[in-house]
Amino acid sequence: MTITNQQLFERSRQYIPGGVNSPVRAFKSVGGTPVFFQRGQGAYFWDVEGKSYIDYVGSWGPLILGHAHPDVVRAVQIAAGHGTSFGAPTAAELEIAELLCRLLPSLEMVRLVSSGTEAGMSAIRLARGYTGRNRIIKFEGCYHGHDDALLVKAGSGALTFGHPSSAGVPAETAGHTLVLNYNDVAGVEETFSKMGTEIAAVIVEPVAGNMNLIKATSQFLETLRTLCTKHGSLLILDEVMTGFRVGLECAQGLYGIKPDLTILGKVIGGGLPMAAFGGRRDVMECLAPLGSVYQAGTLSGNPVAVAAGLETLHQIQVPGFFDKLSTMTRKLTEGLTAVAAKHSVAFCAQAVGGMFGLYFRKSPPESFAEVMESDREAFNHFFHAMLKEGVYFAPSAFEAGFVSAAHSNEEIDKTLAVADRIFGQGMRRTEKATL
């Protein structure tokens, strides 16, 4: 007898907190039973009940080539056959470090780690060690991993210290983090004018992907660069999501912004656990064993993950790769916007490279507050209706979606046809029409 998603979820909750190993997978935001998957191929994956889905999550971004790309699978098999871990230097980790520095002009040196959280917390420690300062600026709605210093929410005013957004984070730790509004140039200028000499770094997603998808304005990023330079603070671009997902030179290439440090993850591991942080040589040389800022990891530079990452990075350098990816993503977002308008549904969408955001409101949001004004009940209805028809979007109104190189006109057309039927069957139409 075939096991069901519900049966697995009930068993999982006995042994795994909430039944999942990362909270969003529990479907708490949208309700219902999480889907348990057992295999994937290209733009599709299949659950334990044998149902297939067009996948617009892509393991939350890493699978830019799609599921089980044959060249990536082959690279992993070869690497694993030679040994799954050495805890020592390898030629392959040097190769990927050289490649990352060649592809991203802002990287003069790079350190490999195993997760985006690890990269983010290491970059923060490095910035503090380099500058001798403690204060960090982050922006409301941006997510940089579950490091204590970054699980912080805004206080009651622009210059108030942050408060923990998770139990277990000491108030003293959160107090070193200032939380400002995304795309708020005036707020950043005011904060630097009063506290600039105390700020070690500003960390920001150039395209935010954890409050759905919000693009930074050019003025916002240029202001951050100017103020960090003026006050001796480091600008850290969190490109865990956008890195090699929105273009070959990442979001910093699209905006023409050169950060002091960059955080990378997801795509560079090809679907296996790997991330990195890197940047200016004088800053990176503060890391042990050269300097006094300590960072280490047993599985850092894991040879199997490096093999998957190298093959993925080679594939995305093929001429025209990002043109095709962007075209498919825009076809999806523009098509969804058109069918929603056809049925008078308050809806919009936008895309950057292979990332996209869907919003049940009339215009794309520019801040966390505007995201919160979107019609989340309408999103939840849409999510479950699409899921039932075999289209898998992120199970949260606050997460970006992803298109892979394996998505073709066939998958996009199927998705739009399903959305057309669902929008036509009676979504909530005008509640948020003025937003």
Curated annotation (Swiss-Prot):
Task: List its EC numbers.
Answer: 5.4.3.8
The protein's GO terms of the molecular function aspect are: glutamate-1-semialdehyde 2,1-aminomutase activity; pyridoxal phosphate binding; transaminase activity
Pathway assigned in UniProt: Porphyrin-containing compound metabolism; protoporphyrin-IX biosynthesis; 5-aminolevulinate from L-glutamyl-tRNA(Glu): step 2/2
**GO terms of biological process kind:** protoporphyrinogen IX biosynthetic process
* Residues recorded as bearing N6-(pyridoxal phosphate)lysine in the entry: 266
Cofactor(s) in the UniProt record:
pyridoxal 5'-phosphate
A Gene Ontology term for the protein's cellular component: cytoplasm
Localisation? Cytoplasm
InterPro entries attached to this UniProt entry? 4pyrrol_synth_GluAld_NH2Trfase (IPR004639), Aminotrans_3 (IPR005814), Aminotrans_3_PPA_site (IPR049704), PyrdxlP-dep_Trfase (IPR015424), PyrdxlP-dep_Trfase_major (IPR015421), PyrdxlP-dep_Trfase_small (IPR015422)
Q: What class of enzyme is it?
A: isomerase
* Pfam families to which the protein is assigned, alphabetical: Aminotran_3 (PF00202)
Provide the primary localization. cytoplasm
**What chemistry does it catalyse, as a reaction equation?**
(S)-4-amino-5-oxopentanoate = 5-aminolevulinate
Query: Does Nucleotide-binding count among this protein's keywords?
Result: no
- PANTHER family linked: GLUTAMATE-1-SEMIALDEHYDE 2,1-AMINOMUTASE, GLUTAMATE-1-SEMIALDEHYDE 2,1-AMINOMUTASE 1, CHLOROPLASTIC-RELATED
Instruction: Give the multimer and partner information.
Output: Homodimer.
Protein family (similarity comment): Belongs to the class-III pyridoxal-phosphate-dependent aminotransferase family. HemL subfamily.
Its protein name is Glutamate-1-semialdehyde 2,1-aminomutase
Q: What gene name is given for the protein in this entry? A: hemL
